[in-house]
């Protein structure tokens, strides 16, 4: 025991001596002896004690907890005894360094020689633990990295290299000497990071001393030294751990990906083999056939092969160096005149893009999956094979690319989430141990109190573990820290400590349980640390403050030591002024999640005392609320109360080490609290005093009054509004800069800049005066403002000297000041900030990876790139690896997802295998894993709640107050004017506001149901007045604000309520709502009850509330916290709302009523609104009179027509027809006269039909209903467009410009289909709900991008021009020939030179946005970057890589502008999805986790039913075959053969030898024969049942097709496609095998996720198709005649509908949109010809840039950013659901297995089995349902109901077994009823049965019968014995008479008298009457039947089985 109870302070450290070693060996021997006895005990089944575990806070490389105090100086670096009890029986010792880091060593001999006491080993240990040693190694690594990054190192670096090797060798030697080599724990090679060091050193020596030929390859391994940084920095180790974990998790996804890619690659191989070599070759004439020479254009080639392989004979694609591909099918690319399509030369892209063999096809598919440059492959393939193969690409892109790549994201995100959960679990574990420790110490304390020991005077560790070091020590430590400047003075900064388990863990424990911060007061009561007090919600005590503690620490402590720092009273020095809020408080109970540097999310500050975050219950068991009756007289009432127990128990300490472990747990938290307390004093006291003396200016009264005046102005909301407007204006001014500005304009901008700089400087100055510098600089925003102002002033000063555009760009940061008043931007910056914080370590890891790969690339490939130098100019290609910067750029480009083109270059210079390896490694590790981890982090720190209801701060409210004031002013003016006008006409009614002011209204809380005030009746526009105006705060009126403001109880969140409003108001519930309105009286008076308003009015009010700003979130929160507001309960209907969304009534009930009402009322509504009728009384029609009656009848008829389902079907048909007609209006329409005429007539017809439909609906529904429905509005507008164009055509204005552009709007017709298709409507609803959030993010994106755009304009405006010689193509001239624009124009004598600009440039902010969009989507970004990098100056000729480091601008933009902001779209959409789900799927929210489990199990259970198995044939041979076919092994064999067949197909290549073709054909025949055999055998065995299985039908079809294909292969191949495709389809059968393999669970989960996603994905696909359709119609109307260049050519263009669809499908993934936009940006010569005549009568092949840019950017935002991200959101969502399902205890497969086994026991599918076979059945099941034998007792205990014939129903068994797996739960019974109903519905055939008994009751009956029998036998025996004894005595002559006989009549007497010679009593037979026999069973039952019946029924209804516990011995008897 003594070993474990370590005293406090220095005495806890003992030197490690030989005695210590001997003690350890002794303990080891004892443990071994104990081990043999425990083994014996475990064999006997006795419980084992829990194995000890190492302590988390005493792990190696952690910091020693403060509990142990500071080790004395002489023990630093010396071997000490291990503090962790876990190692007490292991040979280890620890060493501490100055930083108190723990190093653990093995106490065995190192290298067999050096004992722990050997001087050499001691010296090595001292060196190893020294912090300088670590720093030396770190510096060496970094220096080494710098040297490695040199691309052409000078010769002397060789010696530096030797130095590095020497240092690394020294490091390893020290480690080996100190630790030992590898035999024991904690030795050198036991740490995996040391393997890295070891291999690096071995490599270094190998390359030096052994000549291995290619040394550079081996030398590249030196780069792994960079990884050593990871082993040195502990934080990096954890993140690498997470990465490795996620890679492990990726195994399943990888397998699935490889499988899918293989299947697609096989399909590609079969479809496109050899196609990509088809080229347009110049026509030739074959000369004499003998030698095969050919002639073309007067030149002769010796053979056809030579001719075909000569690149000169191929046609090049327009304006590029690519060869034009073609194909021989009808819809493939064609060749122009003079060329023919032949298979010649190599494949495109240096021969690397092809489907000629499986490997190349696989690479092509991988490229397609990662979507790198896939549009090129798509265009090449479609051109050579045909447009129909777009379907193949759609499949691969949607299934392969979107699904698989996002699965990787989902898996990585889940791995990250799991790691987070693990951290939280670890923290909870600590918390548990902490509580144990507290309990234990409390017990000890109680025991000592009882014994009368003076606990107060003791200061040992036992009494005061929470105050480890005495106050002097701590004070000096703090002073030391302050003097060294390590204490941070930042605002609101959480302390970081070296110990990861210390304060960082504190972040996870949500200790900050906010009690009302306003009422925090210090308590003076002191007591021991274990005194417990009654906690009242209004009080919080402080930490013990060392400085003020008079009696020293030993005397006592403050009671609330565990209350964390953010909730403590701020010390006097740091008391915030009334003007500023104290930092660090958790406001409004919002949980703020912070992310620490490891990316671990921690929850800080929960205002809710019942916070649900892990660790929130930390203090509950410790700070007990003591019952009042335990207060002893000695204690003052209300003071702290002692927790005493009647029987003090210290048994917690009996177990060795338990107390030590407990104390260690306490230490984890206390050391954290210690540091938190210290960090509260942010600055040293002297600094504080200095600051308060000189930075708070309160000198004289005059100054104070000036200050007050300034403060009044500066703090006024209007000032804030003015400043915000200035920021916006300033931003606008900066955005107005552009290329070619006039001097006046430039001057205006400069003056503007001066003015704004002045305004902001003044603002800062006045704020400093008003607030004093001390308080001014305590707010983050103020610091930010001041920095920007200072930079602006610096820029003004320096701009005179030089043109520093760098400083100008700092002005752009002013844009961020908007974040103060724009919550979304603020939140977004916080998210990025959080992520950057979290990503700190991850970024480092990524940087290391990038560095390593860049150096590897440079070392391996650098030298080879010199071969690629341009022969003329001697320039390298843009992308090379000759130096580190370029190598870095290539790696960065790969991380952006572009790897294939740089890899082709690499393969050209360095060979294929190495390049493939390196590039694919970077791609997989960097892009797919690390970047996805980034994204996972981003998504985890993202929550839509932030974006929709952001945190409020004072400034923002100020802005809204200002706006509210302006509104109030306007309202006042308006009201005054109105009153004045009305006053002249009539008396005005009293205003409600006035009433409220006089106190006449019951409450100031106006509910959304309160009737509109009378004013609104007069003036509809001012109806807004009834609701709370934007920006107003209840009770927060500005000074001098006379009237209180009425507010709704809860204001709905904008994004959700808009959604609801949309659904209620516009998406199809209109008919019902109208019917409901019909049945309710319409009343607008103030006395109308709330419910009297119609539904549309309700929704109108809801929509108006939805507009109310988010500023009310604060108040809502307050409302939530207050128990009841006065006056709230006075109106029964308007109860106080708890949440932020106020439900007016129960919406569910409302919705339920609607259909019923709809059935009663089939009448139309009123035509006009009440307002219309009031103004125009003629609108009101009297339906009782004659004309009105007819009108009413007509309306009813129309109503019935419109409501009829056939009408709707007809309209849908017409919509589809009219949309289809639009697709024919292409470029060839003029040539097809008949079609044109037909379309014109059709167009008129459609217009008439739609106009008629509209008129019918007007008459039927009335204007009011028609025009309150969004979908009807859409129809109305589209019909209007058709009508206008029809009228214009009739009047002959068809050719007018505006009419033409209006005609293009007909493309919107398909939108009408949206409201008609349910699936699409769901998706659109979700989208409409997401629009507010999406717009928010889009706006923030634009702000972010604005900064980069303005910076781009500053850097590149006017620099993207170049002088080009037309005759030499588009290459710019050398700058030595032409230097600038003016020279170019002066040299342009022939008209061949001209000055041109890159089309997408930075000449103004708008153009900059387009350029940035291209960079962000990585399309077209190369040209922009090249132009930027080559730019020299304003209007100067570019020079190759003149401005090389401009690449950095793009790198930074890609990281922040593309990576963060574009991925936020995914975040928003995912979150929105979750919100929609919460709103729609009610059950999930109201179910506990436990209930969900049951619910899911039941859902699966109910959908199944027992099926009849296929009967085994009676024929002997058939039966034998049947047995073989139904075995699992047979299936597996067939699968194996299928895979083998695939392998043989993979072997095929293009141009294979005849022998190979022959062999493969034979193998194929063999497989066809085998599969045909399988089919025949199965048919024979299964007979007609064969066709009951869908897989069998599938197989049958494939076999038939294979046979047909083999027989007719030549014909099919000639006219259709390769029949081998059928065999590829057979791969689908692999899906079957996954069910059989239990191990493939992960892959099953992934496929299950896909299956779950399919319905939703289909809907999204439909929506996407609709968008594509509309855009392709627009494209045909606007871009049909643009010039063919860049991405537009003869196949990919907007001339026909099909071609437009090809283009738009390509852009859906944003691929190649720059190429399509490029020709549209042409505006005139020399790029295009505006005079060129077109077929439709128009002229020119120029584009319209504005329309083009709008067209492409909107399409990309809609498809690429929104719709495709919805796809991703659904996959992520379903993946998490599927994973949850797979981790549930019971899966679908378990139920399948149950029924499969059931079939064997119930072959007739009766749904019953006999009770006798139940035991066998339970044993035959697989886990987890299986109950292994012996299982009788368990089965009996289940109390299964039985029917007559002792049969049990399958549902009952399955339910009982499920219950056993999931455990007992209260919800089971309700679910059981639900399940039975479901089962009955699914199986109507289920025999209705009445159970007559249950298994348990049957057992009870059997046991009862046996007990009764035994008792009766015993009773008979006793009586017989008595009688026998009587007879014996009588015979012995004891003089006993007959009367004394115990049995004178009855059975015993009779039998006895029979057996004995002498009869007893008279031999008369009458004595043996029937009654003398024991009563028969029947008679008893009859007599007591009632009684029994009651008990029986009671029993049968008994819920609790525990009422009838079967005793164990009874059971044993029964078994016997």
From Swiss-Prot:
Effect of residue 1767 to C: In LQT3; uncertain significance
Molecular-function GO terms, alphabetical: ankyrin binding; calmodulin binding; enzyme binding; fibroblast growth factor binding; nitric-oxide synthase binding; protein domain specific binding; protein kinase binding; scaffold protein binding
InterPro entries per record: Ion_trans_dom, Na_channel_a5su, Na_channel_asu, Na_chnl_inactivation_gate, Na_trans_assoc_dom, Na_trans_cytopl, VGCC_Ca_Na, Volt_channel_dom_sf
Listed result of changing residue 1412 to F: In BRGDA1; uncertain significance
Phenotype upon changing residue 532 to C: In SIDS and BRGDA1
Resulting phenotype, residue 276 to Q: In BRGDA1; uncertain significance
Keyword annotations from UniProtKB, A to Z: Atrial fibrillation, Brugada syndrome, Calmodulin-binding, Cardiomyopathy, Cell junction, Cell membrane, Cytoplasm, Disease variant, Disulfide bond, Glycoprotein, Ion channel, Ion transport, Long QT syndrome, Membrane, Methylation, Phosphoprotein, Repeat, Sodium, Sodium channel, Sodium transport, Transmembrane, Transmembrane helix, Transport, Ubl conjugation, Voltage-gated channel
Mutagenesis or variant effect for residue 572 to V: In LQT3; uncertain significance
Summary of activators and inhibitors of this protein: Channel inactivation is regulated by intracellular calcium levels. It is a tetrodotoxin-resistant voltage-gated Na(+) channel (Nav).
Effect of residue 997 to T: In BRGDA1; uncertain significance
Impact after mutating residue 1897 to W: In LQT3; uncertain significance
Mutagenesis / variant outcome for changing residue 1667 to I: In LQT3 and BRGDA1
Outcome, altering residue 247 to L: In LQT3; uncertain significance
Similarity comment: Belongs to the sodium channel (TC 1.A.1.10) family. Nav1.5/SCN5A subfamily.
Function: Pore-forming subunit of Nav1.5, a voltage-gated sodium (Nav) channel that directly mediates the depolarizing phase of action potentials in excitable membranes. Navs, also called VGSCs (voltage-gated sodium channels) or VDSCs (voltage-dependent sodium channels), operate by switching between closed and open conformations depending on the voltage difference across the membrane. In the open conformation they allow Na(+) ions to selectively pass through the pore, along their electrochemical gradient.
Subunit structure: Cannot form the same regulatory interactions with beta subunits as other Navs do. Interacts with the PDZ domain of the syntrophin SNTA1, SNTB1 and SNTB2. Interacts with NEDD4, NEDD4L, WWP2 and GPD1L. Interacts with CALM. Interacts with FGF13; the interaction is direct and FGF13 may regulate SNC5A density at membranes and function. May also interact with FGF12 and FGF14. Interacts with TMEM233. Interacts with the spider Jingzhaotoxin-I (AC P83974, AC B1P1B7, AC B1P1B8). Interacts with ANK3. Interacts with PKP2 (via N-terminus).
Name this protein carries in UniProt: Sodium channel protein type 5 subunit alpha
Organism of derivation: Homo sapiens (Human)
